[in-house]
Amino acid sequence: MADSMFHQPVMGRRAFVGGTLAASSMAFLAACGKKGGDASGSESGSKLNFYINNPVCIDPYNVQEDQGTQVEYQLFDALTSYDAEKGEIVPLACESFEANDDATEFTFKIKKAKFHNGDDVTSKSFKLGWERLVNTKSAVATEYGPSEVSYHLSMVEGYDDLLAGNATELSGVTCPDDETLVVKLASAYADFPFVASHPALAPVPECAESDVKSFYLAPVGNGPFMMDGKWEDGQEINVKKFDDYYGDKAKID
């Protein structure tokens, strides 16, 4: 079942990184550390079990429901995030963003960061991540079928051509340098930074397309947690703290 255009996390990043324990049902997402048993995660080295239903997908290219997005919010950082306390969109993986006068072009300045495999996160990482959602001939689409969430980018210039197979890239997304991502829209949309907060629009490293099957089961992200083993359908998903995370460090390991 596809999610809404402006999906927000059931359990926020701040709560998870801070170590709040939550429960749902069936499988669980476990952040494991040196201490045994369930814990609130208030001190480093604790363990948190977060119970969720089995996700449809944990690769950004097709993350679409609450369960998948809960995993995604821990493994990946999109450009922006919704700050519930401020009631506004704020930068996350970007340092800043700005729009032109008619809200048809947005420029994002990318923070210096690393993927879990040590690769640099650049503007091209976002372009690659977005294009594999839309391109039905991408390696991941060839292996697992077209993305069901590419519509998040439907307002971007060049979307229809890439989706139809008449182009090889998303023409509305350009990378003047490694720290700058420019997005041109087909028509004005002032709330595009809100769209850019969706975890499906996270950056991906080159291995997302060069080693599709491995990435699908153990995605390599830029978020505060990284996979600890691969995802097995119907089983627990283990993650651990990413020590080289650019933002606030997790309080659980």
Where are these predicted regions, by residue range?
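N-terminal secretory signal peptides
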Residues: M1-M11, T20-F28
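Bacterial lipoprotein signal-peptidase II cleavage site
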Residues: G33-G41
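Short, well-ordered beta-strand elements
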Residues: S44-N54, E105-F108, L181-V182, G223-F225, ...
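N-terminal lobe/hinge region of extracytoplasmic solute-binding protein
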Residues: Y51-D101, V220
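Sec-exported extracytoplasmic/periplasmic mature domains
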Residues: A84, E131-A139, A190, S197, ...
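Aromatic- and charge-enriched surface segment that lines or borders ligand/interaction sites
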Residues: E95-P146, V182
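Surface-exposed binding/hinge segments that line
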Residues: K127, A141-P205
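Gly/Pro-rich hinge or "lid" segments in bacterial periplasmic/extracellular proteins
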Residues: L185-I252
